[in-house]
Amino acid sequence: MKRMLLLAAALLVGGAAFAQRLSVATNVLDYADFGTLNVEGDVAVARRWTLTAGTKYNPFLYKADTPEPLSARQRLYAAGLRFWPWHVFSGWWLGGKVQYQEYNRGGIRSAVTDEGDRYGAGLSAGFTYMLHQHLNVSVGGGVWGGLQRYTVYSCPVCGMTEESGEKTFILPNDLTLAISYVF
């Protein structure tokens, strides 16, 4: 029994000592999507693996020269894993995650507005370049798919429903030009 406790303590302490490497990142390209705020955190759990969690938030409604406001509002939460063939926070990576998004988008190309919830999983890949011991730049892209519950309205403010329901989707995701700080 004592040996098992000693072994468990050694594994926990050894893992905790390595897991103190973490990074915090923000995707610059998301700010071009109507000012979507975003943050992502990674924790190294092994030499080639990181746990990733991120969120995006856009509460903004824009008034343009058109009678209808522009909206690209969203709340997104994601959690997943990344595999780094060489070493964490440096070089190529492959990722997988589960994701939830609540969205409201409309008035951009037409007055039609759609809102709803999306649940799904995604795959992504990219490359991280070390600028400095603590500063990285990442580029990448991916796709995600799953189930979407939605409602389509005639205009952003009128509330006239055109369509609603559930459907599956596949969308581009994680178009990334991120700046990250590694602790």
Segments (PLM) and residue ranges:
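Extracytoplasmic loops and strand-loop junctions of Gram-negative outer membrane beta-barrel proteins
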Residues: 21-24, 61-64, 106-110, 158-163
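Sec/Tat signal peptide C-region and signal peptidase I cleavage site
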Residues: 13-21
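Predominantly the C-terminal beta-signal and adjacent terminal strand-loop region
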Residues: 132-183
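Solvent-exposed loop/turn segments connecting transmembrane beta-strands
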Residues: 23-40, 58, 66, 88
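Sec-dependent N-terminal signal peptides
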Residues: 4-13
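Gram-negative (and chloroplast) outer-membrane scaffold detector with strong preference
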Residues: 43-139, 178-183
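Aromatic-acidic/polar surface patches that form glycan- and anion
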Residues: 30, 70, 114-116, 168-172
